A protein has these predicted regions:
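Conserved RNase H-like, two-metal-ion catalytic cores of nucleic-acid enzymes
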Residues: 140, 154, 158, 171-172
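S-adenosyl-L-methionine
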Residues: 1-73, 77-82, 86-91, 104-109, ...
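Structured helix-beta-strand junction loops
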Residues: 37, 135, 160-161
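Short, flexible/disordered intra-domain loops and linkers
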Residues: 148-153, 175-179
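Glycine-rich, phosphate-binding/catalytic loops in enzymes
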Residues: 60, 85, 130-134, 157
Length: 208
């Protein structure tokens, strides 16, 4: 299993849900499902934060290698530390900014699973050229609220090449964790909280 860093650059409050395997469980399960069908060699993580998905993708032998982009220097350091701690540093390439150029030049951009979580930057990142270049990869985009562009407009960008499945965050249950039965309701709720201000939505893009 993956060893988590004691000091987390991003989402310190998410540590309990990560330990229990509940953090963004919808996405963990989806990546597993995609790989069962396709067995892509490369995982591309755009907005890697502290490396939970990037490092986990190769620790669990789901992918041969990972390319992770994180704009924050502290974040890149956290990913590197986590990769070293988990003995997978040679399988992970850590880069700073993801843009149309840096992504389109990647060898496996069209043969990978792409996970994107960049706090609203997704609307600018996914240009017509990038969408063409990444086909027929699978992509998972975390959708953030943005008043400058409608979701319908954003969806239209992909429709020629990709089918879109919308995934909505599901309620978490701790009933299977006997070690938490003596925790009060408030503490149990905090353990599974991901601190979101609204119910999260992700889009899974699969090639037509």
């Amino acid at each position: 299993g993956m060893v988590l860093s004691e000091k987390q650059f991003w989402g310190q409050g998410d540590k309990a849900s990560k330990i229990l395997g509940l953090y963004e469980k919808e996405i963990q399960d989806l990546i597993n499902q995609i790989q069962e069908k396709n067995n892509f060699p490369t995982f591309i993580d755009i907005g890697g934060a502290d490396g939970f998905f990037a490092v986990g993708s190769v620790v669990n032998n789901l992918f041969k290698n990972c390319e992770v982009f994180e704009i924050s220097k502290r974040g890149r350091q956290a990913i590197e530390e986590s990769a070293i701690k988990n003995n997978v540093a040679d399988l992970i390439s850590i880069k700073s900014e993801a843009n149309e150029k840096t992504l389109s030049l990647m060898e496996n951009i069209n043969n990978s699973v792409i996970l994107c979580d960049i706090e609203g930057g997704e609307y600018d990142l996914f240009s017509e050229n990038l969408i063409k270049n990444m086909y027929p990869s699978n992509a998972i985009i975390e959708i953030h609220k943005n008043s400058n562009i409608s979701l319908n407009e954003f969806e239209d960008k992909f429709k020629n090449l990709f089918s879109i499945t919308k995934i909505i965050q599901e309620p978490r249950s701790l009933n299977n964790f006997s070690e938490l039965k003596n925790f009060n309701d408030n503490n149990r709720s905090l353990i599974i909280s991901e601190g979101r201000s609204y119910v999260q939505e992700w889009w899974h893009l699969s090639p037509k």
